[in-house]
Amino acid sequence: MKHISFLVVVLLVGCSSSWCNGPYEVYWIDGVKSLGFNVGDGVYIGRIDEPKSIYANEKFISVYACPEQTCAYYYIDREKDHKFAGATEFVFGPYTKESFVELQKKLILPELTE
């Protein structure tokens, strides 16, 4: 019984999504996996569809994603993002791997591994 209680507590604590960092979470709707901004009560504002790899630091989120079957690199400027902002203000991409590596060095983006 102790093990079952412990398991229930572990499952209830923390993020229930596969990835979360602050208000950002990976969620699924109708079989589509998305990275979004959680505004509460199970409501998300989508940022990038079909993320495959996500890494974050205090300023940025780096994402390797394959929306519409085309894979590319993206980043989110966390300092500019908020629940009322339009995605074009803070979601940048798509980039090729080479372009993204240059941006990683210049902006100190979190490093991605595919």
PLM-predicted stretches and their roles:
Residues 4-7, 53, 67-68:
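A generic structural signal for short, solvent-exposed coil/turn residues
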Residues 68-77:
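Structural motif
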Residues 82-114:
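C-terminal partner/receptor-binding element of secreted or periplasmic proteins
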